[in-house]
Amino acid sequence: MMILKSFVVLSFLTSFHSVENQKVVPAPPKIISFDTDYPKNGIWVQIPKGAKKIKFNVRAENTETVLFWIMPTGTQTWKERKLIGYDIKEDDKDNQFSITWTIERPSLLDHVHIQALGEGIANDTINLIRE
């Protein structure tokens, strides 16, 4: 009987020990939505002539910071990107990220690329046009 009790106690303690040593892997960032305060026309966001600002809105889970980059259209333009802003999570319930960018050029034909940073990186892109 003593051996049986010892075996049960040992099994009970061993099962807790293995749970303690298991690694918890945080979920990677996930972009739920990425939009602007202007409507899309196909795959392009049409910026009205004379508009001076544009607001970018991102809803993302498992994300600490969102980086907002602007870069020209075309191939192999990643090295030409410019950081136009970032937003940092304010609390654990905060899944909304946004910036307002001041447009300082008369025309646009660019990509806005976002990176959601957390335990990994998620990416998304929208296209801007203004003639």
Where are these predicted regions, by residue range?
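Conserved structural position at the C-terminal beta-strand
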Residues: 116-118
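Aromatic/hydrophobic beta-strand junction motif of beta-rich domains
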Residues: 54-60
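Short, compositionally biased P/S/T/A/G/V-rich stretches that sit at domain boundaries
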Residues: 21-49
